[in-house]
Amino acid sequence: SRSDWSSDVCSSDLIKFPHQNNNMKHLLIMFFALSTVASAQSDKFKYTDEKFADIQMLRYKVEGFEQLTLRQKTLIYYLSEAALQGRDILFDQNGRYNLRIRRMLETVFTDYKGNRKSKDFLALHDYLKRVWFSSGIHHHYGNEKFQPAFSQDFFRKALHEVAASKLPLRQGQTVDALCDEIFPIMFDPNIMKMRTNQADGQDLILTSAGNYYGEGVTQAEAELFYEQRKAPNDPFPIMTGLNSRLVKKDGRLAELVWREHGLYGSAITKIIYNLQQARPYCETPEQQAVIDKLIEFYRTGDLRTFDEYSTLWVHATEDLVDFVNGFTETYGDPLGLKASWEAIVNFKNIAATKRTEKLSKNAQWFEDHSPVDPRFKKEKVKGITAKVITAAILGGDLYPSTAIGINLPNSDWVRKEVGSKSVTIGNLTDAYNKAAHGNGFQEEFVIDKATRDLINKYGDNDEDLHTDLHECLGHGSGKLLDGTNPDSLKVYASPIEEARADLFGLYYLADAKLVELGLTPDAEAYKAQYYTYMMNGLMTQLVRIQPGNNLEEAHMRNRALIAHWAYEKGKANKVVELVKKGGKTYVKINDYPALRELFGKLLAEIQRVKSEGDFAGARRLVEDYGVKVDPQLHKEILARYAKLNIAPYKGFINPVYTAVKDAQGRVTDVKISYTESYDDQMLRYSRDYNTLPDIN
């Protein structure tokens, strides 16, 4: 699972989002509305880059890379190549037309000979940047299709002016026929309007544009198909359907498995090649075994092999360099079964990891003292490791928008019997913080100077600690009752799981145990996170939503659920209030200890819902508290936010690694640079990591 950067809610504007019904919570860093331009930098590194649409591009510094050994640098180089080879997979998973649309746009952008300063061409450039960022034509966070601001006539004429050989034409297809096929997908707002639809009462597959199910497959058919394939009494159940597309063939359902000689095979073959190149540079035999098992999984597509790989990966803890590469998180599938492809390469920040190790070493204490029913607690917490890492490269569904924390694997039985790894991505958190300073957000939305001072004093540490608690302990806590289907919460699994991990972190942030462990400086520190969390959940995350829309994304639903539930349940005692000052709405917290008790009660209920597989309970919580938006408050928040000129979403440009080789082809050094522009990086990736055909 992952945690994400929430929004301009705290001093660092880092707000984390937990993930879906998978427990791999990547702290998804949807660094929401945090910064525009960093005002004062303590170093000369340029953290902020260009801004377009609702997105601010950032850069992250790979601190310590130059001090690594040549072996470690070379390992990172080849693992990074493997991390970039799967880019086309995500585009295709997000929509069956995405690769063709991207290639049409790129060809016009690079080869167009007309007026490149015209309104239409500039609009095409902006649209292409958004397609690159979202790995498709739907918003990376809100899931809605974004509309081109250039005309169909302009695009058709431009496509006729470039070489037809560079266009994604079907065999025998004309340029006009290509336009007739693709333009409705791009320009008609009523066709494929949502990438992942979660609206209650609708067929979530037929109304979603994602490419995890073939044309004509219904939600009822898919649910029955996978229900029949589950072994009800299997103590080690595989994650059914994780790595395949479900299609209809001659009226019957069948899976197209993502593997070397199956669907996406041409991309997977290149991933395997680079994993093989990395293998000799592994630091331990355990890490070599991880790569061997991952390659075996990529070749066979066998999900039992995937569990074996996950087990080996959890046990491989002695290496400085680590990585994730594969089909991981299920946010993009409305049924929460099928995983998008993602990758990250990283190395441990040894000094910062001392913080997370204090939590993992005390995991049993936190489990024993949580406010949930003892029936839902783990009697013995196993194999929880936690570390702070430095990201070296981001790929797939972790790029350009990424996570600030990751907790894997997502398999419930592996987490229970083997354990899990939790990471907080320190250099990404640092980049968000550096870019967010001085953007005016706090002054606009935080109720008073005393609260702002509280946030400035404790906020950054609170954010890091909440991420650690969320990933390391929250996702790793609790257990399913025997016989509970791990997929029983369906579309509500992700927001419920993210809420569970967030609540675990919120509850324990206020505990004296953290002061005892030296993780918080005093008993007042937790209040900064409580305030920013409630402000974000009740108000400021709404800047990411278009007027009239509901909350769709799992992390946003989770935050709204927690904040609105606590607000409503504490209303009689005025625990939290929404007050007016000068015509503006603010969050006011009157009783922080009572708010903690409310978080504990909701944690107990959400753990019960998950442990028992209570679909009706999950549906009630999410639909009642996590979906609807107050239109008047929304209008006010949008107007106030617009004046700040802050982009509500953030993403990263990757560094560039160059291998220096001798006459025999041996790597003698690996250089890192941070100068590549967003356009140049995306065009290079489309050229050098062009791994899939137009239609898959």
Where do the language-model regions lie?
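N-terminal-proximal low-complexity accessory segments that begin disordered
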Residues: D43-M104
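An active-site-proximal "capping" alpha-helix that borders the catalytic cofactor pocket
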Residues: T69, T284, S494-D511
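Long, well-structured alpha-helical subdomains associated
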Residues: K61, L506-V609
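Extended, compositionally biased alpha-helical segments that mediate assembly or anchoring
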Residues: D591, L595-N696
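Post-HEXXH active-site segment of zinc metalloproteases
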Residues: G478-A499
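Single conserved hydrophobic/aromatic residue that forms the stacking wall/gate
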Residues: S1-D13
